[in-house]
Amino acid sequence: IIASSIERFATEIRHLQRTEVLEVEEFFGKKQKGSSAMPHKKNPILSENLTGLARLIRSSVIPALENVALWHERDISHSAVERNIGPDTTTALDFALVRLSEVIKNLNIYPNRMVKNLKLTNGLFFSQRVLLELTTVGFTREQSYSLVQKHAMNSWNTGSSFYENIVKDPVIIKKLPVNKLKKLFDFSYHTKKINIIFKRNLKK
């Protein structure tokens, strides 16, 4: 389970380092090579390594389960297995934890790229707030979902502003005035508890 949790972090970092995303990036030394064949690449090699280690560690689960059934509650058929997977697995896990810690400590973060990627959605990440607000002004959830989805799909397909699509809908504006609707597109709403979250989860 710990190894799989490590892999979750590693997989997320690998995705976020892709050229078209590039919101975070592993530290890259001056003399480091990202690819032996392509000099321009900066592959997340440490996170890739952690993914492989997680697979290796999980491979110990099957022999561990095979050790459950012993003759008359006790024989030594399990001994060779435990002598192998015990030290190998714990050593690999310790190494993976230390490596993940170093990756996170030295991770390059690109907030401006995060903002740029959010803007590419044309405001679609506000759709849930609009949906929930509509259910408080007289629409059923089904009606709210249908209204929001229609404008969200239009934004996806045409690249138009989700807010502009919503604000032009007379059915929505009749019950949700523009001044209230505009507040639903305030990005700070999603980050207002960020300090509390960090303090709660990063206690020493």
Summary of predicted features, one role per range:
Residues 38-204:
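Glycine-rich cofactor/substrate-binding loops
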Residues 1-61:
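Acidic, glycine-rich loop-and-beta core segments that form the ion-binding/anion-interacting portion
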